[in-house]
Amino acid sequence: MASSAAQIHVLGGIGFASSSSSKRNLNGKGGTFMPRSAFFGTRTGPFSTPTSAFLRMGTRNGGGASRYAVGPVRVVNEKVVGIDLGTTNSAVAAMEGGKPTIVTNAEGQRTTPSVVAYTKSGDRLVGQIAKRQAVVNPENTFFSVKRFIGRKMNEVDEESKQVSYRVVRDENNNVKLECPAINKQFAAEEISAQVLRKLVDDASRFLNDKVTKAVITVPAYFNDSQRTATKDAGRIAGLEVLRIINEPTAASLAYGFDRKANETILVFDLGGGTFDVSVLEVGDGVFEVLSTSGDTHLGGDDFDKRVVDWLAAEFKKDEGIDLLKDKQALQRLTEAAEKAKIELSSLTQTNMSLPFITATADGPKHIETTLTRAKFEELCSDLLDRVRTPVENSLRDAKLSFKDIDEVILVGGSTRIPAVQELVRKVTGKEPNVTVNPDEVVALGAAVQAGVLAGDVSDIVLLDVTPLSIGLETLGGVMTKIIPRNTTLPTSKSEVFSTAADGQTSVEINVLQGEREFVRDNKSLGSFRLDGIPPAPRGVPQIEVKFDIDANGILSVSAVDKGTGKKQDITITGASTLPKDEVDQMVQEAERFAKDDKEKRDAIDTKNQADSVVYQTEKQLKELGEKIPGEVKEKVEAKLQELKDKIGSGSTQEIKDAMAALNQEVMQIGQSLYNQPGAGGPGAGPSPGGEGASSGDSSSSKGGDGDDVIDADFTDSQ
């Protein structure tokens, strides 16, 4: 076995050992074979790409190796939307008239805050309405949830301190968000699903068509667990997620949608919670990602946090009070910091006024200060420095220099910060391209990909890459990489493993994702166990383990015993994603909530309609007065009172029945007016303003039988 072969811990084994025929250990140096229990594997060759799943294409530049593109799964005659599920704001877009178009939400806005709240009465609020009440309901208002999705508790220590709600761990060390208002703990996927549900409902109204399929974007540097969790969120929301697409890649699709010239572009994506850099070749409908890099712990929230900490420190120095321990004060500080950051994009200084931020025995306390752009940049200087490394890494991985870059595309609201734009100029030597809207371009690109899958867009080929390496835990707690980062997707890699102990029937393998050398520094995607291996001398069984990464960047693992042809069942355990049964339960809960929400909305709409009917009926009775026969009027008034009673205490259906009964009686008013002498036939009756038709002067008009029509002068009878 080659020195790069993986040695894996055996289930119940007592240690690790190299089993290379050259007796090499994992660091490639000679060593003595230790007869301990070990599980080892041998690479079967270079990366194998299943050509049946791809469309072979020639390169644009001529020569070189052939490239592959995934054959899209097309959805016929059904609207597929593109969704940018952001940390701070989200957006949805669709192909309209052959072009990607942003969908406006129910409030008339083009983006929706990624905020969900629960009131004390148990009502759920999503979007702008949830954001508005955050200050008075900080512990039940969930924002920046994207920073927790698909993560373990030990991965979000810093992020959990930046929010006003409680972030707790469950028995599996997964992140849960506590909601005191309804006494429930939510997974991040559930909260994200509620944002997705609103976006899709808004899209359905905008497009006048039910939407059930979507393409959802994620940061390019999201790992497998985070991608899977995002897909689960879509499923909980009742969506079929056709594709998970990287945000910088989506931005490039929107940027290059109508462009024919070949360009090499660098997409600089600094959002609310994550930072990505991707280098792509774009042109002639081909979008090839050359490399990607990033930092999922860096975003606009971190810039806000620096301002919050500065304000809190200054206040504590002056007043001796720690505002960070006050949830309501923390929420006010966070909103003020975000507002100041936005204002400093166009101003050199901004006033920060927070009256009644807290109170002591001496009375209320206020914050009144000025933040300059220079001070803001000083507070965030180390964050700006962290931006450099991913940019340099992405170019190095793409084997390009800055002079090879034609355009630098800025994506994400945080790229509006002048210091960020200046840093991009210094690092790349290019003037950033600001022709795209940084808040909308990702959703527009997702809509283009949705159009490709729906068959609305043709002649576009997308070649994306895996952002992080996939590997296995090997001797000495070392990670041995199997699929390196920036491998074009989809991809497949096989390893042949065998046993290291006589009669061994099962093994356990720890799957990792990351770039660090040691297991402890990388993300564990979970472990899988191979059972049912026929008892045999060590080294005899041949188990082929296949690692597949699909077009969504999501990993799956399968195994086959080459000796018997038997396919082994593999279950991934220990991953920071939700178990299938828990996702199914959340889907059912979401459906139940959707039904409850629909019933509540129906009740509100019915009550509003009933109030309107009562008003219009009372108005008509008053305006027509004595013209209505007494018997008819009594019946209408009786039904009117019944409807009023039902509005106060009846069910939705009872209100609807009472409205129908009242409308039936109101129709008799018109009938009785038609039957009165001089009513003028079927065309007579109450006018829109409630006045009856005049029977005097209008009689000079002859019917519609071809006789002359005489103009009549009308006088106001009042």
Swiss-Prot record:
GO BP terms in the entry: protein targeting to chloroplast; protein transport; response to heat
MF-aspect GO terms: ATP binding; ATP-dependent protein folding chaperone; unfolded protein binding
Swiss-Prot/TrEMBL keywords: ATP-binding, Chaperone, Chloroplast, Host-virus interaction, Nucleotide-binding, Plastid, Protein transport, Stress response, Transit peptide, Transport
Listed Pfam families: HSP70
UniProt biased composition (Gly residues): 678-693
SUPFAM superfamilies cross-referenced by the UniProt entry: Actin-like ATPase domain, Heat shock protein 70kD (HSP70), C-terminal subdomain, Heat shock protein 70kD (HSP70), peptide-binding domain
Chief subcellular location: plastid
Comp. bias intervals (Acidic residues): 706-718
InterPro entries: ATPase_NBD, Chaperone_DnaK, Heat_shock_70_CS, HSP70_C_sf, HSP70_peptide-bd_sf, Hsp_70_fam
Observed effect of gene inactivation: Variegated cotyledons, malformed leaves, growth retardation and impaired root growth. Defective in protein import into chloroplasts during early developmental stages.
Keyword Transit peptide: yes
Transit peptide location: 1-92
Region (Disordered) residue spans: 671-718
GO cellular component: chloroplast; chloroplast envelope; chloroplast stroma; cytosol; mitochondrion; nucleus; plastid; thylakoid
Tagged with keyword Cell membrane: no
Cellular localisation: Plastid, Chloroplast stroma
Quaternary state and interactors: Interacts with geminivirus movement protein (MP).
Job of this protein: Acts redundantly with HSP70-7 in the thermotolerance of germinating seeds. Plays an important role in the protein precursor import into chloroplasts. In cooperation with other chaperones, Hsp70s are key components that facilitate folding of de novo synthesized proteins, assist translocation of precursor proteins into organelles, and are responsible for degradation of damaged protein under stress conditions.
Family: Belongs to the heat shock protein 70 (TC 1.A.33) family. DnaK subfamily.
This protein's name: Heat shock 70 kDa protein 6, chloroplastic
Species of the source: Arabidopsis thaliana (Mouse-ear cress)
Organism lineage string: Eukaryota, Viridiplantae, Streptophyta, Embryophyta, Tracheophyta
